Every structure is written in structure tokens, then in C-alpha cells.
Amino acid sequence: MFHPGMTSQPSTSNQMYYDPLYGAEQIVQCNPMDYHQANILCGMQYFNNSHNRYPLLPQMPPQFTNDHPYDFPNVPTISTLDEASSFNGFLIPSQPSSYNNNNISCVFTPTPCTSSQASSQPPPTPTVNPTPIPPNAGAVLTTAMDSCQQISHVLQCYQQGGEDSDFVRKAIESLVKKLKDKRIELDALITAVTSNGKQPTGCVTIQRSLDGRLQVAGRKGVPHVVYARIWRWPKVSKNELVKLVQCQTSSDHPDNICINPYHYERVVSNRITSADQSLHVENSPMKSEYLGDAGVIDSCSDWPNTPPDNNFNGGFAPDQPQLVTPIISDIPIDLNQIYVPTPPQLLDNWCSIIYYELDTPIGETFKVSARDHGKVIVDGGMDPHGENEGRLCLGALSNVHRTEASEKARIHIGRGVELTAHADGNISITSNCKIFVRSGYLDYTHGSEYSSKAHRFTPNESSFTVFDIRWAYMQMLRRSRSSNEAVRAQAAAVAGYAPMSVMPAIMPDSGVDRMRRDFCTIAISFVKAWGDVYQRKTIKETPCWIEVTLHRPLQILDQLLKNSSQFGSS
């Protein structure tokens, strides 16, 4: 049952209307239905307004009145629905058609149309060709607003192979989750991958981990190398990737690393990659050409009595090319194959700590006993007798020339850091505050130049290795060997056995002071960083920091220098 004011689809009995498509009056015979006139007219008007089939019919909403007489204009009318007189393109009742219900009437008030309008033909509808759907329409429509599962599924379709599918899936899902809150960068990644780099995109950054590596499914690798292998080059190594100029994230950025695979290019490299080359850890024997004659030290020996390469021949062929020692970071070291000789005597202290504010040492040198304390805590406490518990309280150290920057930084030290000396000679660190570390071992694992960057650590309950005694021993052995070779070659040139032009190049940074800094010390800055991307270029410009001198590697360095001196004097 229809009620007043409700619209319905057009359905009339003996309905007459004007069809402008044929220019003639049409009478449609329909089965009689019990619709009231008001509902019929409102339904025709609804049909006209909704479907726009008859553009000449008036398009206006029904009007509601309160049972007052309505005077129609002087136009021809149709007295009833069963008899027709002059018709001007629409139905016009002879008197207002109404359905009274609570004194409410629905009246249709049309406006007559002219004969020119009735006879005019509507323009033909132009044919619109459908837009072709690109083959990768699903990828194009994928945005950062979609679910992580859908985005990951689309990105997996563009992998280049070469990696385990389960590893690829987990690596992509992990990346998408990290970028879900950075929609602009996630959109940039989707665009870069789905367009194969044809569309320029911005940097896609993730937070740099504490050791600079990405761990997925039990495997570790450098983040930008991992995703470059997934989406571009399955067999690429770290040393073959070069950052493009459009990448705005520097390689030594302390917090972020760009993993956009199209912000790097691959270059041909004949260098031997470091430990970052593969996601798999391979324990292959170290070649003798890298270890020299002192490669794997016999466990029965104490210290090598003579330095390596005793079979030095002072003569050089006139056309012999200059021997250039490869860069240290480019030569792989299998630390499991290196044996560190036992010390000739036990040490009383395993480290000593000096506290600095800017370039000024504050207080006395703090020494940590090797027998009583295997770990040391450096915090912002006020206990002046904390050394009895293996604790250095920086809050108890006064400085009459303390700057405002140092005062503010000291407030955030809190529980500080904890350094632990392990039985194998390695040193690990646990951070309870924001710190930046200078460590030669961390530089080696990251493949960067020694002492060139600060490694950022955030408060974390896990400990991380910041020094490896096997690595330090091997590196000091190499530099000492390089220095000895240069001395012998220089002596041969002076004696006339070879010209100076063919003298082997000495390995850089082979000086004692530099070896001590790179392999025997760790520096930790609290709160503030330093480096090329900061106003503070060196650690001596930071407000408060400590320098930890490790006595065990110092002992090794001293013995190596003694052996070199004995060889040089013999």
C-alpha cells in the first residue's frame, strides 16, 4: 500500500505522454492499478528526474499545500485520465489532483512547453571508448592506505629470485610494517618497485640497528643490500653498491639508512668483500696469503719470537711493479681461525677509564681490577666510593669550568653504561641511556674507515660486542708487518739493491699512536654525537664522554713492537 508523499516507479492506466524521441503522442495501455493520481504524477516526476529520458518534461519536486484552491494557467487540459484533448507534452489535470490525508495534498504543478521545444530532437550521445586497463593495474592501485598483507603480496610479485621465498616474504613483511607509519616513504617504495625505477622516488629509510644489520628469519645482512638483492640484483655484494646522487640519506647517517633499491647502482668490483658480503655466515679457512707466515699461531707457542716474512729478499727486479698493500677493511678475516697467544703475565687491571668534558680530562684515571670486577658501570651517580663496587659515578666529579652544555648532558646520563670483559678477551656493552661509541671493531663490521663515525646505541637490555681481541690482534699484526716491510725495502733502496720507486707502499695508519687508538681504546659520548653530519666534528667537541683503554690489546701491541725492534736490530 502506498502512502501520500511516497514516490513510485511510473505505472498508470491509459497513460498518455509525449515522447520527444519520436515527436508524437503515445498512448500506453496498462493494466489498471489502484494508485491515486497524486502518487501517479509524483512517480512520473521521479522517473523523469531520475532517469532523464524525456528532457522536455518539467523537472521539479512535488509541492505540498493545505487544501486551498489552486488556479492553473490557461492551458489545454486533460479532464480525466480516460479522455484526452489537446496535449502539450505532459499530463495536466483539469483540477488539482490530491489525496487528502490529515489535510495534506500533493499537487503536481508543471510548466507548459512550447511547440519548438517539443519538436526539437536531443543531440545524440557521444560514444565513449573505455579506458584500457594497464597490465599492472593491481600494483598501480596499491597504496600505503592498503593493508600490510596486500602491500606485501604486491611487492613479492617483483622479486628477482635468488633468495629463499620464505626469507623474501618475511623480509618484505618486516619492511612494510616498519614503514606503515611513514606513508609517504611507503608509497615511494611501492612506486619504485612496481615501476622498476622508471618513476623518480624519494628516500625510503628505516632505523639503523645497533650493529647496522638486518636480521630476518635467523639471517643477518646489511639492509640496503638485502632489498637490492630481492628487487634488483640477486647476487650483488655490498662493495658493488654505490649510492646515487638523488639519495638524500648519507651513508654514515647515525640513525637512518635508505633501502630504496633504485637509489643505488651496481659497479664492477674486484675487491674481496668483507663479512657483510653474504647473509650466510661461512666459516672457511683463512688463506695463507692473508695471514702470512704467522697465520694460525701454534697453541704451544707463547709469542712469536720473530715477525712474519723472515725470508725477505733485498733484491728487486728493475721492472717490478710497486707492491700496494690492500686496504684492511677489504680483506676478510675469519676470526674463528685466529689464535691469540696467551699473555706472558696476568694483568692487574683489564681497563682504565678517563672522563672528559670537551677536550679536558676531569678527575683521576679510573682503573678496573681484573681480579675483583669483570664488569664496570659508568653512570651519573653521586657515590664517591663507587670504585669499591666497580662503579664510576660521574655525578661526583666536579669541574669549576663546566659549561652549560656539559651540565645539561650530564642530567641525561642516568644509569649510564655497563662494560663487561669476557674470558676470551672480548668486550661487550649494555646501554641504559643514549650513547655514541667510537670503536674500531664496529667500524670493521660496518665496512667503514676507522674512527670515521659514531655508532649510536639506545637504551637496551641486550649487550653488544664492541671489541674482539682476535680482530685486534690480526689487524695489529698486519700493520706491524707492513711497517717492517717498508723499513726493509727502504734499507734495500739505500744499499742500492732497488730503486725507491719500486719500494712497497706502507700500510696507512701504521703508527703506534694510531694503532693504540684504533685497536686498544673505546670512546663513549653521552647524549651527543659527532661526525660529518653534525656541528661537532670530533668526539673532543662533545660535552661529556669517556675513553676506555683496554690493557690486554695494549699488551699485545707492546709485544709486537718489541719483536719488531729485535728484528730490526739483528
From Swiss-Prot:
Gene3D superfamilies: 2.60.200.10, SMAD MH1 domain (3.90.520.10). GO terms for molecular function: DNA-binding transcription factor activity, RNA polymerase II-specific; I-SMAD binding; metal ion binding; RNA polymerase II cis-regulatory region sequence-specific DNA binding. Residues 150-273 form the MH1 domain. Residues 121-134 have a biased composition (Pro residues). Keywords: Cytoplasm, DNA-binding, Metal-binding, Nucleus, Transcription, Transcription regulation, Zinc. The keyword Cell inner membrane does not apply. It is found in: Cytoplasm; Nucleus. Coiled coil: none annotated. Pfam families: MH1, MH2. GO terms for biological process: anatomical structure morphogenesis; BMP signaling pathway; cell differentiation; dauer larval development; determination of adult lifespan; nematode larval development; nematode male tail tip morphogenesis; parturition. One of its GO terms (cellular component) is heteromeric SMAD protein complex. Residues 115-134 are annotated as: Disordered. Belongs to the dwarfin/SMAD family. PANTHER family: MOTHERS AGAINST DECAPENTAPLEGIC HOMOLOG, SMAD. This is Dwarfin sma-4. The gene is sma-4.
